[in-house]
Amino acid sequence: MDIASKVEGFPTLGILYYTSTLLAVCTYAALIIISIPKTGPASLVRYSSPAIVLTVGKQLFHASYGVSGSLAHRSLTLALTALFILQCCNFLVLTRLDAKDLAKKNIFQDSDHMIYKAYRVVCLIFNVRGIGTPWQAKHLCGFPRFYQRGKGRGPTPIWFILRQSLIVAWQCLLLDIIYTTSMSTPKEDTLKLFGEGTEYMYLDANAEQWTGRFIAGIIAWVIPGRVSIDLPHRVLSIISVFLGFSSPQQWPPLFGSMLDAYTIRGFWSTFWHSYCRWTLTTISSFICRDFLRLPRPSIVERYLNIAFVFLGSAVVHMAIDSFCWGPPMKTKLPTLAFFGSLVVGIIIEDTIQALCRRITGEKRRDGDDGVPVWHKLVGYIWVSFWFMMTSPWYLYHNSRLPPDDTWLVPVSFVDTFGLDTATMLLFGSGVILKFAIGIEV
């Protein structure tokens, strides 16, 4: 798809409708949160509000389908929409936050005007990682050492915007090359590697199909998957800081280092983005502790909590897939199986680590300190193996989508200057950025 067709088909009205509706439903939830008590007759309005929020959320899902012609853009928009809607419901009926609670947490002051209070609650709903609040997600990656050069103790707006802009340009070039390369692959080769049913081939898979598993299980996560989610986050941070809506300190890196992904647990808790963590852990904690009343701490509560988090993530991703891909809708059980397998993988690795500690008498380590290199190497092999076995269940469908649905950036440098030139520029600029501004790995 060329840029002219993308510009002609730019859904301005659809984006305005989606944005205004999202702001309206979040503002409605915020007003209920700060004005309706948690108990008493009036609380019925609070506890019935999720029905309205979820109904509008369904309409937002339909509206967000037309926000972009790119699967990656639609998927991220739908994912964030789902999280915003679920967060509204969390605040209303699960954590049951009210004006007093939020004042105690320094979200606003009791003396603030109601309009400002509503604004702060809407910002909290959009702040799905809880940055700068008591609910901030654990294991967030700190700011790069680049910002500590000289006498600096943190990012200044100018350096933050400059660094983010350079990385965004480099990421756009990377995604452009990936898309162009994938489109140049003959259709028969794509079908051979990622065709219907190949995700379930193991013993009878040939070397080329195992290469496809390596691409889907490892490369797809750490390069295009990571970058396609990270790029919009950086763009939003540039706009927000440039317009003065927020400070650079409110935009820590979205992803951690891939070097920390030597366990499945570490992959999701330390390396991968934490967009879903606050929302889904709130729901899982409510089910395990308030509804099922499981003792805490206990093994059952710990792993059932993890299971409900990944189940919630699976449900969100299945809903996204249904709206992104459109009819005819195929079964989404492979997606459910993939996210469920992660729970099994975490239980396996926790069990093996516990047995090793019992045999050797070694104490459990907190964090990354003191982990031997050979432990990490074994861990990388383990995580790679598990993702190669299970990721195709979830990711192979993307490779079967039509080309017009899989573009990643609106302007193609490759189409203008050629793939060879773009590739040389990518590697050359990547080395420069690594040493000049400390681009993350």
Curated annotation (Swiss-Prot):
InterPro entries: Wax_synthase (IPR044851), Wax_synthase_dom (IPR032805)
Pathway(s) per entry: Sesquiterpene biosynthesis; trichothecene biosynthesis
Residue stretches spanning the membrane: 14-34, 75-95, 158-178, 306-326, 336-356, 377-397, 421-441
Subcellular location: Membrane
The UniProt record lists the keyword Metal-binding: no
A GO cellular-component term linked to this record: membrane
Domain of life according to the entry: Eukaryota
Gene Ontology MF terms in the entry: O-acyltransferase activity
Disulfide linkage: none
S-adenosyl-L-methionine as UniProt keyword: no
Upregulation: Expression is positively regulated by the trichothecene cluster-specific transcription activator TRI10.
A biological-process GO annotation: lipid metabolic process
Keywords: Acyltransferase, Membrane, Transferase, Transmembrane, Transmembrane helix
Pfam families named among the record's database cross-references: MBOAT_2
Membrane topology note: Multi-pass membrane protein
EC number, UniProt record: 2.3.1.-
Catalytic EC class: transferase
Family: Belongs to the wax synthase family.
Role: Acetyltransferase; part of the core gene cluster that mediates the biosynthesis of trichothecenes, a very large family of chemically related bicyclic sesquiterpene compounds acting as mycotoxins, including T2-toxin. The biosynthesis of trichothecenes begins with the cyclization of farnesyl diphosphate to trichodiene and is catalyzed by the trichodiene synthase TRI5. Trichodiene undergoes a series of oxygenations catalyzed by the cytochrome P450 monooxygenase TRI4.
UniProt-listed PANTHER family: LONG-CHAIN-ALCOHOL O-FATTY-ACYLTRANSFERASE 3-RELATED, WAX SYNTHASE DOMAIN-CONTAINING PROTEIN-RELATED
Miscellaneous comment text of the record: Trichothecenes are sesquiterpenoid toxins that act by inhibiting protein biosynthesis.
Protein name (database record): Acetyltransferase TRI7
Encoding gene per record: TRI7
